[in-house]
A protein has these predicted regions:
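Cationic, low-complexity basic patches in intrinsically disordered or flexible, solvent-exposed regions
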Residues: 11
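Alpha-helical transmembrane segments and their helix-helix packing motifs
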Residues: 18-191
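Ala/Thr-enriched low-complexity intrinsically disordered regions
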Residues: 2-3
């Protein structure tokens, strides 16, 4: 076998590598789904609060849980695109993004359909869906900056305030968090 492919690996070594990649892939999907669910809880909590500051604070607990648990959230990874850790792993970003989007939307959609809690976010979603491309881009860049500050700040300081404050800023400024936006769309019952 090794001679056929011009390498010195044994079949058992190749199978171990393949199995390790399969495990890594399944962990990526699981961590991405859990991250989407945690952000979904943040969305639900945020729009359930009458006080926007309290809602923004409680939303930050979703990202805090994602970071503490080491889950895979697209918006926490994309800021590191130029780093060696992420370079060449575009497929992980794409898979993570889709798993985040599907899980946050599904949780919020099901919550809106089966919960007795009345959630009003149609105005928020309508505003986001009707904003111009330049507005959306500026708001997305603002969110990306806040997410990078949160994730990178926590990795360097281990201080929860470095997560909480940037998240509160992006929520209170109305920045566009692509994963959270899907949660809000799900809460409105949109497909």
């Amino acid at each position: 076998f090794a001679t056929l492919f011009g390498c010195n690996l044994k079949l058992s070594e190749i199978l171990i590598v393949i199995n390790m990649e399969k495990i890594r892939f399944l962990k990526l999907i699981k961590d991405s789904i859990v991250a989407g669910i945690l952000i979904g809880f943040g969305c639900i909590t945020n729009v359930s609060c009458n006080n926007p500051v309290v809602g923004a604070f409680l939303f930050s607990l979703g990202l805090f849980a994602v970071i503490i648990q080491g889950r895979y959230l697209f918006t926490g990874k994309i800021g590191y695109c130029g780093n060696e850790e992420i370079t060449g792993k575009n497929y992980e970003l794409v898979l993570g993004l889709f798993a985040n989007l599907i899980s946050v939307w599904l949780l919020c959609f099901l919550f809106a359909k089966f919960s007795s809690l009345s959630i009003e976010c149609n105005e928020l979603v309508s505003k986001k869906l009707n904003e111009g491309i330049v507005d959306a881009l500026v708001r997305s860049i603002g969110c990306g900056a806040m997410m990078y500050i949160a994730v990178d700040g926590y990795s360097k300081t281990k201080n929860p305030i470095t997560i909480i404050m940037p998240v509160m800023v992006f929520i209170l400024c109305g920045f566009d968090h692509c994963i959270a936006n899907f949660g809000y769309i799900g809460l409105c019952g949109y497909f």
